């Protein structure tokens, strides 16, 4: 008989440029019993990255086999590579009593809700406006016009799902957004 996991899942979704990664990093420093979920990917390992720390690096055939076997909570194909959250790694962390923070797209977040129900808290990080989002993405200087337009289309798509999340945090002020996210998580995990 399986032991019921005691940890909970906190799921972050946001359009690129909304500040999700920054908020997640700050919240992880503030909440002791919260770990960051390590995703699996088929992208090439970059210098300085460690397997099992930054990502679980899998080849395409292994990743696709795990998809067929139901080995992912969620997965997506994005910019030529697979990314996903491994079911066994997630269950292992939850069974240890730790809470887990996942950074996934909106469809992945909704799938987490289907699988984990009330043991999951879905938080959507939203930019104050599309204009601010455009400024943030342009400020990165890492996107050409075509890539920027693609990210903006994806942002509009992702923002259309925000009302299906438990909490929407508008990142107009980083300190306030981090405080609001922390309060929502602490309230949820007890």
Swiss-Prot record:
Protein name: Guanylate kinase
Annotated Guanylate kinase-like domain residues: 7-186
Gene3D superfamilies: Guanylate Kinase phosphate binding domain, P-loop containing nucleotide triphosphate hydrolases
Record lineage: Bacteria, Pseudomonadati, Chlorobiota, Chlorobiia, Chlorobiales
An example molecular function term from Gene Ontology annotations: ATP binding
Localization (cell): Cytoplasm
Top EC category: transferase
Reactions mediated catalytically: GMP + ATP = GDP + ADP
GO cellular component: cytosol
Family named by the database record: Belongs to the guanylate kinase family.
């Amino acid at each position: 008989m399986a032991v019921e996991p005691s940890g909970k899942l906190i799921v972050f979704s946001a359009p690129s440029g909304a500040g999700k990664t920054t908020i997640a990093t700050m919240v992880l420093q503030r909440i002791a019993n919260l770990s960051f979920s390590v995703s699996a990917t088929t992208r090439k390992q970059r210098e300085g990255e460690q397997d099992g720390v930054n990502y679980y690096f899998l080849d395409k055939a292994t990743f696709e086999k795990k998809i067929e076997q139901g080995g992912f909570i969620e997965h997506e194909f994005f910019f030529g590579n697979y990314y996903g959250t491994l079911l066994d790694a997630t269950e292992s962390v939850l069974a240890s009593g730790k809470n887990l923070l996942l950074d996934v797209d909106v469809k992945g977040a909704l799938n987490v809700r289907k699988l984990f129900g009330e043991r999951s808290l879905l938080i959507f990080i939203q930019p104050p406006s599309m204009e601010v989002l455009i400024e943030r993405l342009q400020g990165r200087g890492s996107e050409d016009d075509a890539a920027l337009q693609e990210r903006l289309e994806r942002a509009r798509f992702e923002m259309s799902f925000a009302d299906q999340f438990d909490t929407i945090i508008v990142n107009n002020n980083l300190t306030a957004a981090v405080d609001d996210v922390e309060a929502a998580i602490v309230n949820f995990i007890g």
